[in-house]
């Protein structure tokens, strides 16, 4: 499972798709989610605005499996 480190409280699923190179621009997020199954914490998700937080898992078949890591929490901050 690949780790995606964020330095904010959350990222949206649309931002995440761009971070993982599943899409080349943010404008493609809506199309991508309508054409491909994306699983967040084991459930199909189609909302590009879905907030992904520390320890959320994302599975994009054909692209990869990912876990969200909050940089602050990973460095010993409180959750």
List the model feature ranges, each with a label.
Residues 1-3, 35, 57-60:
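Low-complexity, intrinsically disordered short peptide segments enriched in small/polar/basic residues
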Residues 12-54:
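A basic, amphipathic helix-loop patch mediating RNA/tRNA/ribosome contacts
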């Amino acid at each position: 499972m690949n780790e995606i480190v964020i330095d904010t409280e959350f990222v949206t699923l649309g931002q995440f798709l761009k971070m993982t190179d599943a899409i080349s621009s943010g404008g493609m997020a809506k199309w991508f989610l309508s054409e491909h199954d994306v699983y967040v914490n084991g459930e199909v998700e189609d909302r590009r605005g879905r907030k992904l937080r520390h320890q959320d898992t994302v599975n994009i078949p054909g692209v990869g499996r990912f876990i969200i890591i909050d940089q602050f929490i990973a460095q010993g901050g409180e959750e």
